[in-house]
Amino acid sequence: MTARHAEIVGAGLAGLTTAAVLAGRGWSVRVHERGEELREIGAGIYMWENALRALTAIGAFDLIATAGENVADTQLLDHRHRLLQRQWLRGARLYTVLRSDLHQALRTVAVAAGVQIETGSEVVAARPGGMIELRDGSMLSADLVVGADGVGSRVRESLGLTRSVVDLKDGCGRHLIERTADDPVGTTFEEWNGGRRLGVVPCAAGWTYIFLCCPENDQAGIRQDPFEPAAWLETFPHYASQLRRIPRDGPGRWARFFDVTARSWCAGRVALIGDAAHAMSPNLGQAACVAMANAVALGEVLDGRAVEDALPRWERSERPITDRVQRYSRIYGWVGTHWPPSLLDVRSSMVSALARSKRLQRRINCGAEYFPVLAQ
């Protein structure tokens, strides 16, 4: 029997996970990356239980467990440096890792499974019948096309699947610093002060990940390229050691957050995955995690089914949880970044009270404890 063939647009985390899943199930897979080289932009990333199970499914977990940090405690503090919440989802597994290490691990397992990766290959459109159009005008056909080409997805746009792309009016700078004895081990810290949020995240041997979030109208806060620590030192004096170690001319920069809502995740023999289907703010550490879990579900539902029948089934099963994660992430961002400055103590009291509810914790971070029912 001839193997079914997939063309995947985008060699980011979602695209490579999908490629590894399909190749592991006997598909021939080609991934198109418009850049001349494979690279992952960013600093560190959270891998919650759902992502760890996806990594296990494709044989990449050991690579991440070796490269990353096993986090036992997460702490949230307020503008008075008071502890509001700790051990979010107590007992759940959490690893933090360099995005570059995660990307390399996914690439390694995908290539080992037989995936072909084409760099400098720019896809400009897709057709519902399983066709993609390259920049040079050539057309390629497949049993399945997967658009994993990000917020500005050309696959999604070419099929008229965009419902909305919403600028959330805030964003984040992501930075890496060399780890010292001042930095936490096995514990992450996030502190809120006004509309600014700072995170200190151990994520690999020798490295600590720093994230600095603020609304778009915080002109001093968004100027992070080059990085000047003065404004952030004034807001977060307890983290002076970390802030002063952020490289002035490093790769970190402030980038906007967007929510993407698609009319559908599929059209004919074309599927959308990751940011192309459901970009969200990273406030719950779930944007990549749900994409990776959705990739595993996609591979499962395609087994023994026609592509045109499998894709709607996949969306019906997985979209509700992804939409919920996106919504809670947006709410988290509003509370942390857009809350009225005169009501910060009210915010602290509210968050502290809500954090004591285990039921609410699981409701807000529903994605972390969910793994596709189709993949059971």
Predicted features and spans:
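Active-site substrate-recognition segment that forms the wall
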Residues: 187-219, 236
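C-terminal helical "tail/cap" subdomain of flavin- and related membrane-associated enzymes
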Residues: 1-4, 66, 81-82, 284-285, ...
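Conserved N-terminal glycine-rich FAD pyrophosphate-binding loop of Rossmann-like flavoproteins
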Residues: 36-54
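Conserved mid-domain beta->alpha element of the FAD-binding
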Residues: 8-24, 32-35, 147, 251-335
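Conserved N-terminal helical subregion
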Residues: 2-6, 23, 48-159, 163-180, ...
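Histidine-centered metal-chelating micro-motifs
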Residues: 153, 172-174, 196-199, 277-278
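Flavin-binding catalytic cores
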Residues: 221-254, 315-316, 320
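Short beta-strand element of Class I
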Residues: 29
